[in-house]
């Protein structure tokens, strides 16, 4: 009995060669629309889909394969006489292989000038239906959605006259993943179009970007997936220019670093980070000086860290950076001389280019946190705050220099793990106290790290002070200005302590926990 294949593809890469090989093996080819034209033009004989259905393609191609003569040929179980008799009685010929890929919905909605009508028109209906029918009947039917699988199918057909059950099952699983992702993307697009922020069903689709050697620890398996609709300002979109492939921990740290740098748009800024916490942030009129400040913030912790810059790296800055052991450098661009310095002297240094002009787009993405048996979803902590909305709650007002430092520190503190404390001046961090289970311990940690650089320093806290003992510790260290959200039932005790020691304290009214 002659084997039959139905071919209908939007991605025509390799399809002519695949069809030619099938012809050599004696297969009969059914095809549709543009695929049939491409095959006919290449000299591959095909049968038109309407010759099988007895019904013309119509409505601009919207209706062409949704017909019992197609789906009966795909779904008929070869092990059931009743199915085979029904097919025979209704003159339905069996189809043994389906090669289909879908209308380019993703590519369409990524176009900057796409219209809603264009998006709707590129939703494939017949393609997913054929794929699902064939995949459901994988006991008898081979289904191919990815040109990368053409070779393995041809090899098995040439060797054995049919594909193995294991191959058919694997390809069916791939099809169901593919159609599920396709539908999820359509659902995501329509959900956004209607402005639904809390859908009763959450469908997300990601594409495998990089298999990883291991996860957070060597005993953990891991992979890196990228959103099907890529975010421009993200570690997934960065271009790697040098060094080993990124590890699981590299990617998490790099993501944390670029989230921080987004908040420092106006001035050349350098962020150094280790284990998801900033260990140095420097801001200046030029990127070289910003590097100096970030490095001087904590010359010990920066060792083996990640550095992200929001301006092009020049030769002078590269010379300074190459003297420090770093895992990753991320910047919008590098001068040729700077890149040569870094690559020539650091063969394993991971150097990434990530244009900074798209950074605001990444702020609109939701954040997902996995818990056992569930998923937490929240919008990002990117509330637009203005110092004009802050409240000075003490008798003493901040000086102009203190006000600048308080604003700088408030940008930085929301990226420190809670309980988070940071000590800064107006252009660099001096001490970081992250992740302690009581706030006064974080205060002590940050102050101890700042040590002899406390003259003129200020302190920021990601959440309110539950007791006045925090203010007592701060005053004892000689720090004269504090910024915190406020909101404790004991706020007045902290205010009175600040007044007692001549401190100025600002309440922002916005908490910035980070867990």
From Swiss-Prot:
Pfam families: AICARFT_IMPCHas, MGS
The protein's annotated pathway: Purine metabolism; IMP biosynthesis via de novo pathway; 5-formamido-1-(5-phospho-D-ribosyl)imidazole-4-carboxamide from 5-amino-1-(5-phospho-D-ribosyl)imidazole-4-carboxamide (10-formyl THF route): step 1/1; Purine metabolism; IMP biosynthesis via de novo pathway; IMP from 5-formamido-1-(5-phospho-D-ribosyl)imidazole-4-carboxamide: step 1/1
Any one cellular-component term (Gene Ontology): cytosol
BP terms from Gene Ontology: 'de novo' IMP biosynthetic process
GO terms assigned for molecular function: IMP cyclohydrolase activity; phosphoribosylaminoimidazolecarboxamide formyltransferase activity
UniProt domain MGS-like: residue ranges: 1-145
Top-level division of the source organism's lineage: Bacteria
Keyword Cytoplasm: no
Keyword field: Hydrolase, Multifunctional enzyme, Purine biosynthesis, Transferase
Entry-linked InterPro entries: AICAR_Tfase_dup_dom_sf, Cytidine_deaminase-like, MGS-like_dom, MGS-like_dom_sf, PurH-like
UniProt catalytic activity: (6R)-10-formyltetrahydrofolate + 5-amino-1-(5-phospho-beta-D-ribosyl)imidazole-4-carboxamide = 5-formamido-1-(5-phospho-D-ribosyl)imidazole-4-carboxamide + (6S)-5,6,7,8-tetrahydrofolate; IMP + H2O = 5-formamido-1-(5-phospho-D-ribosyl)imidazole-4-carboxamide
This enzyme's EC code(s): 2.1.2.3, 3.5.4.10
Entries under SUPFAM superfamilies matching the protein: Cytidine deaminase-like (SSF53927), Methylglyoxal synthase-like (SSF52335)
Domain commentary: The IMP cyclohydrolase activity resides in the N-terminal region.
HAMAP family to which the protein is assigned, alphabetical: PurH
Family stated for the protein in its record: Belongs to the PurH family.
Protein name per its UniProtKB record: Bifunctional purine biosynthesis protein PurH
Species this chain originates from: Streptococcus pneumoniae (strain Hungary19A-6)
């Amino acid at each position: 009995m002659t084997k039959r294949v139905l071919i209908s593809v939007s991605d025509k890469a390799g399809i002519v060669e695949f069809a030619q090989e099938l012809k050599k093996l004696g297969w009969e080819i059914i095809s549709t629309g543009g695929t049939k034209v491409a095959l006919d033009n290449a000299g591959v004989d095909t049968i038109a889909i309407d010759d099988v259905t007895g019904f013309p393609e119509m409505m601009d191609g919207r209706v062409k394969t949704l017909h019992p003569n197609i789906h009966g040929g795909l779904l008929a179980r070869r092990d059931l006489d009743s199915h085979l008799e029904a097919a025979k009685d209704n003159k339905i010929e069996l189809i043994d292989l389906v090669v289909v890929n879908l209308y380019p919905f993703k590519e369409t909605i990524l176009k900057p000038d796409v219209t809603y009508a264009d998006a709707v028109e590129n939703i494939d209906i017949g393609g997913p239906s054929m794929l699902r029918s064939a995949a459901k009947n994988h006991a008898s039917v081979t289904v191919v959605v990815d040109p990368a699988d053409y070779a393995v199918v041809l090899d098995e057909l040439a060797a054995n006259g049919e594909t193995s059950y294991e191959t058919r099952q694997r390809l069916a699983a791939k099809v169901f993943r593919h159609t599920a992702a396709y539908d999820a993307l359509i659902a995501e697009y329509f959900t956004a179009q209607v402005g639904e922020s809390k859908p009763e069903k959450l469908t997300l689709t990601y594409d495998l970007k990089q298999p990883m050697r291991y996860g957070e620890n060597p005993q953990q398996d891991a992979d890196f997936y990228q959103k099907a609709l890529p975010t421009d300002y993200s570690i997934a979109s960065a271009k790697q220019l040098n060094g080993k492939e990124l590890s699981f921990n590299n990617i998490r740290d790099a993501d944390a670093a670029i989230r921080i740098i987004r908040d420092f748009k106006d001035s050349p800024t350098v962020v150094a980070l280790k284990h998801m916490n900033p260990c140095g942030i420097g801001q200046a009129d030029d990127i070289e000086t910003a590097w100096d400040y970030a490095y001087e913030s904590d010359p010990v912790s920066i060792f083996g860290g990640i550095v992200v810059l929001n301006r092009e790296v020049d030769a002078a800055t590269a010379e300074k950076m190459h003297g420090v052991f770093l895992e990753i450098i991320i910047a919008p661009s590098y001068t040729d001389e700077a890149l040569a310095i870094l690559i020539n002297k650091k063969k394993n240094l991971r150097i990434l280019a990530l244009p900074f002009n798209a950074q605001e787009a990444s702020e609109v993405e939701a954040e997902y946190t996995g818990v056992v048996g569930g998923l937490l979803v929240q919008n990002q902590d990117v509330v637009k705050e203005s110092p004009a909305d802050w409240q000075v709650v003490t008798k003493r007002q901040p000086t102009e220099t203190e006000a600048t430092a308080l604003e700088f520190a408030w940008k930085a503190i929301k990226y420190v793990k809670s309980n988070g404390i940071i000590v800064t001046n107006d252009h660099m961090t001096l001490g970081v106290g992250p992740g302690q289970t009581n706030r006064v311990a974080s205060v002590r940690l940050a102050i101890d790290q700042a040590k002899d650089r406390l003259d003129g320093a200020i302190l920021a806290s990601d959440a309110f002070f539950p007791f006045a003992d925090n203010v007592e510790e701060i005053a004892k260290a000689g720090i004269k200005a504090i910024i915190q959200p406020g909101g404790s039932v004991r706020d007045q005790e902290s205010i009175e302590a600040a007044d007692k020691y001549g401190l100025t304290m600002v309440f922002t009214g916005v908490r910035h926990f980070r867990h």
